Amino acid sequence: MPTIPGFSQIQFEGFCRFIDQGLTEELHKFPKIEDTDQEIEFQLFVETYQLVEPLIKERDAVYESLTYSSELYVSAGLIWKTGRDMQEQTIFIGNIPLMNSLGNSIVSGIYRIVINQILQSPGIYYRSELDHNGISVYTGTIISDWGGRPELEIDRKARIWARVSRKQKISILVPSSAMGSNLREILDNVCYPEIFLSFPNDKEKKKIGSRENAILEFYKQFACVGGDPVFSESLCKELQKKFFQQRCELGRIGRRNMNRRLNIDIPQNNTFLLPRDVLAVVDHLIGMKFGMGTLDDMNHLKNKRIRSVADLLQDQFGLALVRLENAVRGTICGAIRHKLIPTPHNLVTSTPLTTTYESFFGLHPLSQVLDRTNPLTQIVHGRKSSYLGPGGLTGRTASFRIRDIHPSHYGRICPIDTSEGINVGLIGSLAIHARIGHWGSIESPFYEISEKSKEIVYLPPSRDEYYMVAAGNSLALNRGIQEEQVVPARYRQEFLTIAWEQIHLRSIFPFQYFSIGASLIPFIEHNDANRALMSSNMQRQAVPLSRSEKCIVGTGLEGQAALDSGVSAIAEHEGKIIYTDTDKIVLSGNRDTISIPLVMYQRSNKNTCMHQKPRVPRGKCIKKGQILADGAATVGGELALGKNVLVAHMPWEGYNSEDAVLISERLIYGDIYTSFHIRKYEIQTHVTSQGPERITNEIPHLEAHLLRNLDKNGIVMLGSWIERGDILVGKLTPQAAKESSYAPEDRLLRAILGIQVSTAKETCLKLPIGGRGRVIDVRWIQKKGGSSYNPETIRVSILQKREIKVGDKVAGRHGNKGIVSKILPRQDMPYLQDGTPVDMVFNPLGVPSRMNVGQMFECSLGLAGYLLDKHYRIAPFDERYEQEASRKLVFPELYSASKQTVNPWVFEPEYPGKSRIFDGRTGDPFEQPVIIGKSYILKLIHQVDDKIHGRSSGHYALVTQQPLRGRAKQGGQRVGEMEVWALEGFGVAHISQEMLTYKSDHIRARQEVLGATIIGGTIPKPEDAPESFRLLVRELRSLALELNHFLVSEKNFQINRKEA
């Protein structure tokens, strides 16, 4: 079986390509810069550039919120042409953020990743559309490297038009003449000159009589705002720059595609659209009209290209050099004007390059914060491919045809793994064997079947459609198996059944077509694709548990997924372990002693805990590549996202209806689903107009128990247990004392009690809702240079221990997700015939309608593996060997477990896979046999502690005066129209009035409630309209509609007019 390529290899190879080739290409484009008098010339000598190794380590960059980058130095020379003197210096250009071996960059202490973008490849594309009369109109679209799309079309009268915008079109002879070709040259270089001669009349012939007339006509149509332009060299240059260079630049890939599609041989360095290209495009377009040639499929991957991290970084580097060029030009002119002697050091600043990359990593849509929920998430994030981003599509305008699966995706883009929601089909994931080729195409490996050579070849999408490719045959696992006579195959985007002798290529691996997430689902062939999609997404949301456990039933890729994620500590040299603890491992070998630091309670950006545990004892000899310590969610070097728990599929008093899950309290007391979460809180100190803010533990008017954990500096002590509302950092902000700002009662009390007006306002960092835990790290980052614009920052990290509770979300690996609805005592849970209580009870109705039967196979095989102490690794699509192959695998294992453990209930022939179980409350058996087994269940990041919320008081919206929405804003829950109907249905008049007035948007009633609460007494009823009604009246007035409303007195039924 061939080795699977590294899952992070695509990102890292792209960055290496940028360092090796992209930097040099862009530096060679840097022009020689002269002053206005052409006496001084500045130039870069790009042959001798160098990147300096960073002074800090990755871990320190994350901890101190710095950028892990390398300094770029280039030799530059300043030449005085009068004396022919040259001054050469090595200058600092700027910092380039580096990428680690996992494909991540660290910018301002945050792990970031640049995902690959799929764009339409530049070139020429032919398509046919029906007009309003039902007649086919053939068009040829020239897609440039920068996204411009000029079109050529031929109508039913065989007239050829050039269309640059949707509304305007012009005869093809005009742009051809404007590009420098006269009518005679055009007719000599086309295959159908009679068509070109048939449609121009005398007026049009005059327009193309000379290049000047053609340029004027073209400029009138597309670039002129008004009036009659006059031909000039500046107008010609402007048209050349705005249209023929910016909108018609093909680029390196576009020139290659154009030459292949039109069968021409223009040199690769001619990256702009030439008159010869236009004439060849028109020839093919006329041939399409006459039924010759084939139309292009725009959604085929051969017509797409990958814009990788190398391309994006190279574009940003080129942009930075353009900014540097403008800065150097301005500095030279300023130095000459002020009669100063410039040097290369004085001319060049590092600001353009540094700020360009900071802006790119911080603001570009394709640069994203690395999702580090668990190890699987980290490697999957780097293999995403997106149609979105600059130059791409948007979620609201993309059609269904673009989102759909295309036959060319086979083995390149996973047909299952995509995002859900508005971006479905637009954000995909690369297949595990796919790689990005030199020309930006996605290549897939195949095993070549011939007598001369039997080797693996990587083919781009434009080549494999010419071969007969065997799809899913027994040779995909073992080359020695006898070939079948007739096999399913793929040829020219069609799936056929042909003889084995006609096969050219075959697949190399059963997982070749899937992404990493889909490849970790056992028995995936028995699941509906929608549920497999949910499963591959939910595995990325699994929380690393405090006690991880390997899955009993897996697919075999768990080891490589854990290895490539980089969370485990790997021995880089062979040697002997001489010391080990929770902080480091010391290795002795080759006369050197190496100390390997371990990650201890590091926070991910999803607040999960990244921690490494040593696996090697002291005195053990190890080899290179051996695992020294397991990381988060890994055991023995294999991915371990969940737990193997005993599940039963049966209803239980309605507590597991509609995807609810019933669990045993053993999962809590045994710390089965306990996870650690780390939250970071920070506060800054600024210099205000009244003076600097102070960090202190002397906070007036605060209760002592809130300050109990502060040290003498006013910062919480390490190891303290913190509850909601406690002070983490004590801070006072100076303010001007104004007696007039206080209420009269407040001033009277201050005068009686002798309390002085405070000159400082308390602005402490307090622990918000749901943040209780243990302080594990406190860091005070001092400002450098004493600048008031660079404030001091204090960071406090708090560790939380979370057991599973009601409201948490759990899921299996087959899209079977649910919310914990009730936690039963273990004695009340249903129990097996040997007395073992089950851990979870799932609803059986969730299986048949969702068609994810793979969980049944996993459940039964997991029970057999648990009893036999075995682990299984199942390849997908085993049904291709024989029918019912999965069932024939599971049932013998259950039978073997039943015999070895002398438990006949494990496999009962009447209902294999099911068993009679008993009600824990009564001891009576249930009426029907129940499917029981060991399933691998994950605890997801959607936890009730992060979501539950109640509002007592909070902020209100300025316009509607209604409570804000959302937990972060202390918002409330909206009582809408249907909720009011429900309240009315129960006849709760007072509750309805409260919801619509006091607790919502009645300003005066809210104030009266506050007063009545303080003084005592009954709360008065609101008499006027709430603010939302007044807002409606004002909006109607803005539309010149007056709405009057009246309140009728209950006593005398008189109308009392109230203004809105």
UniProtKB/Swiss-Prot annotation:
Record EC number: 2.7.7.6
Q: Which Pfam families match?
A: RNA_pol_Rpb2_2 (PF04561), RNA_pol_Rpb2_3 (PF04565), RNA_pol_Rpb2_6 (PF00562), RNA_pol_Rpb2_7 (PF04560)
What catalytic reaction does the record list? RNA(n) + a ribonucleoside 5'-triphosphate = RNA(n+1) + diphosphate
Alphabetized UniProt keyword annotations: Chloroplast, DNA-directed RNA polymerase, Nucleotidyltransferase, Plastid, Transcription, Transferase
Ranges annotated as spanning the membrane: none
> Which Gene Ontology CC terms are recorded?
chloroplast; DNA-directed RNA polymerase complex; mitochondrion
Its annotated compartments are: Plastid, Chloroplast
Question: In which broad location class does this protein mainly occur, judging by the first location in its UniProt entry?
Answer: plastid
**Record carries keyword Protein transport:** no
Which InterPro entries does this UniProt record tie to the protein? DNA-dir_RNA_pol_bsu_ext_1_sf, DNA-dir_RNA_pol_su2, DNA-dir_RNAP_su2_dom, DNA-dir_RNAP_su2_hyb_sf, RNA_pol_bsu_bac, RNA_pol_bsu_CS, RNA_pol_Rpb2_2, RNA_pol_Rpb2_2_sf
PROSITE patterns recorded: RNA_POL_BETA
Broad class of enzyme this protein falls into: transferase
Recorded hits in HAMAP family, A to Z, give: RNApol_bact_RpoB (MF_01321)
Protein name, entry field: DNA-directed RNA polymerase subunit beta
Q: Which organism is it from?
A: Calycanthus floridus var. glaucus
